[in-house]
Amino acid sequence: MEITFLPLILLGAAVLLLAIFFYYVPFLLWISAKVSGVNISLIQLFLMRIRKVPPYIITRAMIEAHKAGIKTLTRDELEAHYLAGGHVEKVVHALVSASKANIDLPFQMATAIDLAGRDVFEAVQMSVNPKVIDTPPVTAVAKDGIQLIAKARVTVRANIKQLVGGAGEETILARVGEGIVSSIGSSESHKTVLENPDSISKLVLRKGLDAGTAFEILSIDIADIDIGKNIGAFLQMDQAQADKNIAQAKAEERRAMAVALEQEMKAKAQEARAKVIEAEAEVPKAMADAFRTGNLGVMDYYKMKNIEADTSMREAIAKPTGAPSKPLKD
C-alpha cells in the first residue's frame, strides 16, 4: 500500500496560507472594531501591516478612545505618532483620563509631551492626584552659629502646559533646598526656627520656586528639624587657635631678635674691651717718651703709682668677699 504525502502537503500549504492571510488581514480584530463602533476597513488593517504598524495597537487605542467619548481621534494621527516613535497606548490613556477629569489636553499637546520623553499618562495622573516629594536633609546655619538639619515635603501638581521644556523634580528640590538654607540663615537664632517651622515654608512659598518648571507647588511642609553642631563655636575655636599660633610666631620672632641683639651687644663689648686693652698697651710707651723728653719726672711717676694703688685698694674693699681683685700694675 503506497503512502502519499500530497494531502498532507496541501493541508500544510493551506494552513500556511491562512496564517499569512490572517496575519496581514486581521479579520478577528476587524470584527472587534466593528462591534465596538469603530469605522475601520480590512484594507486599512492590511496597509498597516505593509507600513509595519501593529494593527492591534492602533485598533485597541481607537476602541478605547471611542468608548471614552473621544470622537475626534483618527487612525492617521495614531499611525503618525507611532511611526514618530511615540507611545500610542500611553497617549490614549492620558487623553481618556484627562477627558474624565475635565482637563483640557489636546491630542497634539499629548503627543508632544510623549515625544519629549515624559510620561504623559503619569502627568495627567499628577494633575488629578498631586504628588508628594520628600526632600533630602538640608543643612543650614542660623546667625547664632547653630546648625539645623531640616527635611521637607513638597506637594506638587503637574503643569501640563509646561511639561515640554519645563524643569523637572530635581530643579524643584534644588530650589526648595536653597530656600530653606536662605530662610534658616537669615534667622537670628535657631530657637526662632524651632518655635516657628512654618515660617520657613511660608518664606519659601513666597519666592515662586515653580517658575519655569513642569510643576505647580501646592504646599511645602517642614517634616522634621534636628539640631546639628555648634558651627559658631567651632569657628571661634579655630580662630582662637589661629590667633594663638600667630602670637607664638610673633613671640618667637621677638625672642630671636632679642638673642641676636644680645649677641651683637656682646660682640660690641668685646670690641670695646679690645680697644681699651690696645689703648692701655700704649700707656707704657707714652710714659717712656715722657721720661725721655722730660715731660714726666720721677716724683710724678711715683705719685701716679700711689693713685693706682689707692684705686685698687678701694675696688678690693668695695667688691664682695671672694671676688678676685684687680692686680696692681708695676
From Swiss-Prot:
It is found in: Cell membrane; Membrane raft. It holds the Pfam family FloA. GO terms for cellular component: membrane raft; plasma membrane. Disulfide bonds: none annotated. InterPro entries: FloA. It is a multi-pass membrane protein. Keywords: Cell membrane, Membrane, Transmembrane, Transmembrane helix. The chain crosses the membrane at residues 5-25, 27-47. It comes from the Bacteria. The keyword Ribonucleoprotein does not apply. Found in functional membrane microdomains (FMM) that may be equivalent to eukaryotic membrane rafts. FMMs are highly dynamic and increase in number as cells age. Flotillins are thought to be important factors in membrane fluidity. NCBIfam families: PRK13665.1 (NF010186). Homooligomerizes. Belongs to the flotillin-like FloA family. This is Flotillin-like protein FloA. It comes from Parabacteroides distasonis (strain ATCC 8503 / DSM 20701 / CIP 104284 / JCM 5825 / NCTC 11152).
